[in-house]
Amino acid sequence: MIVLDTDIATLLSYRKNDKLNKRIAALDKGEKLALTIITRMEMLDGRFASIKNAADQDELRVAMERFLQTERFLVSFSRLNVDNAGLTHFESLLKGKKTRKMRRTDMLIACIALAHRALLVTRNVNDYKDVHGLRIENWAD
């Protein structure tokens, strides 16, 4: 299983990174791409902010269209939630000297990827480098 971090999912949704697009297209048919519930929340939070901060009807119209596009994009992936195995990893990362300082959203994404023994694809490799056992690759740079 391959989990896409929020930065990669966002890039993929824009289809503007040729290296990433080619890497995704070259995957075996049996490879499963997934997004965590955290990535879904982060992507939709950004769209909600644009809707709430729209200064006029044109901005609101564009913000609503982008929100709907993002929703359509998100449903094309399997969704991974925090399960019992993820909770165990979460507890462990909270106790780690280096990992307890991680952003909470990154920590939760790492926990979900670990629980599913998944490869995490991210541009933010440094954010996850201290998570023992987490497989990380950058397909965009």
State where each predicted segment sits:
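Active-site neighborhoods of divalent-metal-dependent phosphate/nucleic-acid chemistry enzymes
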Residues: R47-I51, F73-L119
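Acidic, PIN/NYN-like endoribonuclease modules and their adjacent C-terminal/linker elements
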Residues: M1, A110, L114-D141
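Short, well-structured N-terminal submotif of metal-dependent ribonuclease cores
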Residues: M1-I38, A49-L68
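Alpha-helix capping/helix-boundary segments
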Residues: I8, T39, G86, I109, ...
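Short, flexible helix/strand-to-coil boundary loops that buttress conserved ligand/catalytic motifs
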Residues: S13, I24, R47, L94, ...
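Generic structural signal for small/hydrophobic residues in well-ordered secondary structure
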Residues: D5-T6, M43, F90, A113, ...
